Structures are given as C-alpha cells and as structure tokens.
From Swiss-Prot:
Family designation: Belongs to the D-alanine--D-alanine ligase family.
List of residues binding Mg(2+) 2: 319, 321
Region forming the signal peptide: none
Boundaries of every ATP-grasp domain copy: 144-352
Protein name: D-alanine--D-alanine ligase
Subcellular location: Cytoplasm
UniProt key word Lyase: no
Gene assigned in the entry: ddl
Pathway membership: Cell wall biogenesis; peptidoglycan biosynthesis
Catalysed reaction, written as an equation: 2 D-alanine + ATP = D-alanyl-D-alanine + ADP + phosphate + H(+)
InterPro entries per UniProt: ATP-grasp, ATP_grasp_subdomain_1, D-Ala_lig_Van_CS, D_ala_D_ala, Dala_Dala_lig_C, Dala_Dala_lig_N, PreATP-grasp_dom_sf
Coiled-coil segments: none
Record keywords: ATP-binding, Cell shape, Cell wall biogenesis/degradation, Cytoplasm, Ligase, Magnesium, Manganese, Metal-binding, Nucleotide-binding, Peptidoglycan synthesis
Cofactor note: Binds 2 magnesium or manganese ions per subunit.
Length: 370
C-alpha cells in the first residue's frame, strides 16, 4: 500500500511564498508509485484548506493555492469533503492507511515547535524535528546556551530583555560595548528570517537597531560581527546522524577561485560552492560540532548547520536551522545531492526517518503496570 504523504504548506508567515515553491518542488519530485500526495494549504490568514489527492506532476505553483471558491470533490475516510472547504487540523489524523505529514512551513507557527506539538497530540509521524529541537533552535538565546553547554565555539554575544532595555538602556549599551566591538549584529531572538536584523557600526546605530529589533520580539541578541567565510553543512538522521559535504555562500560580487568543486550554483547575486575547500582538520571539527549541536538539541530528520571560518582558521557555529530551505536549488538539498543523495531520494529518506522516530516513540511505556 502507498504511504499517504500529507504536505502542509503556506502559513501565516513572511515566507509563505517560499513555502509554496517548496511544496511544488517536493510534490513534483515524489515517486507516486510509492506515495499518495495529499496537499493541505494554510492561507495567509491561517485557514486550513484541503486540496485534491494528486495523481501527477503540477505545472504551476498557483495550482497549490486553494481557495474556498473551489468545488472539486475529494474522497476522505468515510465521507466527501469539498476541495477548498476550510477544515480542522484533525484531518491530519491517520485513517488506517500509513500516513506521514511533511510540514513545509517556515518561521513562527511552522518551525518553532507549535505545529509539531499538534502532530504529537495526534500521534502521527511527521518529517523533521520535534517540539524541543524546533522551539530551542528557533530561539537564538536558548540555542546559544545549549551550544555553550556542549562546548561548541560561538561568536561573543549579549542577550537583552525589553524590560531591561527600557529601564537601563545606558548600562546595557555600556555592557555591550565592553564585551563586543563594532560592527555588531542585532537580532530578534525568535524570528526565523532576516526580519528585524540590523548591522550596527557605532552607538547610535546600535540604539536604532535595538529599537527596531524590539518591534518584533521582547528578547534580542547582539552578536559580534566577524570577517569570515560562511560555510554550511547538512545533517541527516535521528540517533546516528551523518553530515554532508560542506558548502559555501560567497558574498555578492565575489569570484570563485576554488579548484576542487563539483558544482557551482548561482542564485541572483549569491554563489554557492558545493563542495567547498576546507582544511581536512577544520572539516572534521565542523562535522563534530554539527553533530554535537544536532544531538544537543535532540534533533531528528534534518538540520543545516551554519558556520563562520575566519582567515586564521577560527571556527564558530553561527546557528542551526531545523527547517532549512528545501527547493531543489536550496543549500540543504544541494549539499546532499553533491554527497550522493539526490532530491527525490532525500525526501524518501526523511519520510523513513519520520516513521522510525514515530515507531520508537510508540514503543515507549506511557503507563505504570498494575
């Protein structure tokens, strides 16, 4: 019997359109001999709309933008529901057929543990990270504490609460200027995109950046700016994760001068070099830190680890992303493609990992014996 793969995409997020592109890519990469593709679209307003079961490839992304005016019928477990009709999240519940949810959502309500909690309550297997890893990695302050506890090197940073900023602004600025040197980067603690992030090169810019960041969160992290290469690595697995080859993001206008790479991908003004050239000892450190971060978060399925590597070979883990970009041209799938795992096979592996984790969870005891 085919596995029913529920694709959950859209959402109340600044990355709504990216999520649609991701769903389009995943659906068109699915082996429909193995999977039954069941799309569920979450509108910008947060309404859940169930689409038709898909029997072939899509031609346009817009085919996934369902609305309440659609009238095509879709057979469900014991009744029929109109495609385009608003539904309850309970539609995710398995109906006897092997079912897995693939959440293709980004940012708040998508990769912060909230929708993952829904899947846990429904006891349905789902691709990617659980509640703990998702929520901890979304919060930059909590994430940094976990990495520090694991002994993973990070750039210096200062965490600031809004109430402290309001009451002790001068003292907070003095503390930051004592610990950090300009330039610094000011980031809301709990946003998954670049919204609210600013670079500050002096005190006035720092104050302005803090004011901007506090519009989006009541907690802010201020990080030391470094001149470094940006190198990323994919991690895949559950209890025994493995790492991909490293990839590098070249800044706008940079020219690739590397000898040893299999592929160079160009996206607007950003060049991706995969695999990139890294000293073998540094590469082993990078793998070690990526796996330590993965296990420290109790991650599962997939994680992308983002590093800084300075000219004098100082290595810093900047952050991890528990739901990285997932179109065929995004860094994470490209890293695995160049490691030997193509896009379609990567999707199938993630579904298998979801099933494995769910089976392990259900094998646990949840009540005391009489």
């Amino acid at each position: 019997m085919k596995t029913k793969l529920i694709l959950l995409y859209g959402g109340k997020s600044a990355e709504h359109e990216v999520s649609l592109q991701t769903a389009f890519s995943v659906i068109n990469a699915l082996d429909l001999e193995k999977f039954e593709a069941a799309p569920i679209y979450i509108t910008n307003e947060g309404e859940w709309i169930q689409g038709p079961l898909l029997s072939g490839k899509l031609d346009f992304v817009e085919q996934l933008r369902f609305s309440a005016t659609d009238t095509i019928k879709l057979a469900t477990t014991e009744s029929e529901k109109s495609e385009g009709e608003a539904i309850s999240p309970a539609v995710l519940e398995a109906d006897g057929q092997e079912t897995v949810v693939f959440p293709l959502l980004h940012g708040p309500n998508g990769e912060d543990g909230t929708v993952q909690g829904l899947f846990e309550v429904l006891n349905i297997p789902y691709v990617g990270n659980g509640v703990l890893a998702s929520s901890a990695a979304m919060d930059k302050i909590v994430m940094k504490k976990i990495f520090a506890d694991a002994g993973i090197p990070q750039v210096p940073a200062v965490a600031v609460r809004l109430i402290d900023w309001k009451n002790y602004q001068e003292e907070m600025v003095a503390e930051m200027e004592e610990v950090l040197t300009y330039p610094v980067f000011v980031k809301p603690a709990n946003l998954g995109s670049s919204v609210g992030i600013s670079k500050a090169t002096n005190k006035k810019e720092l104050v302005d950046a803090m004011t901007e960041a506090f519009l989006y969160d009541r907690r802010v992290v201020v990080e030391q700016g470094v001149v470094a290469r940006e190198i990323e690595m994919g991690v895949l697995g559950n209890d025994t994760p493995v790492c991909s080859v490293p990839g590098e993001i070249l800044p706008e206008g940079a020219v690739a001068t590397f000898y040893d790479y299999k592929a160079k991908y160009q996206d607007n003004n950003t060049a991706l070099i995969i695999p990139t050239e890294v000293d073998p000892e540094i590469l082993e450190q990078m793998k070690e830190y990526a796996i330590q971060a993965f296990l420290g978060l109790d991650a599962s399925g997939l994680v992308r680890a983002d590093f800084f590597l300075t000219e004098d070979n100082q290595l810093f883990l900047n952050e991890v992303n528990t739901m990285p970009g997932f179109t065929p041209y995004s860094m994470y799938p490209l890293l695995w493609q160049e490691t030997g795992l193509p896009y379609g096979a990567l999707i199938e592996r993630l579904v298998d990992l979801a099933k494995e984790r769910h089976a392990a969870k259900n094998a646990l005891k949840y009540k005391l014996e009489d």
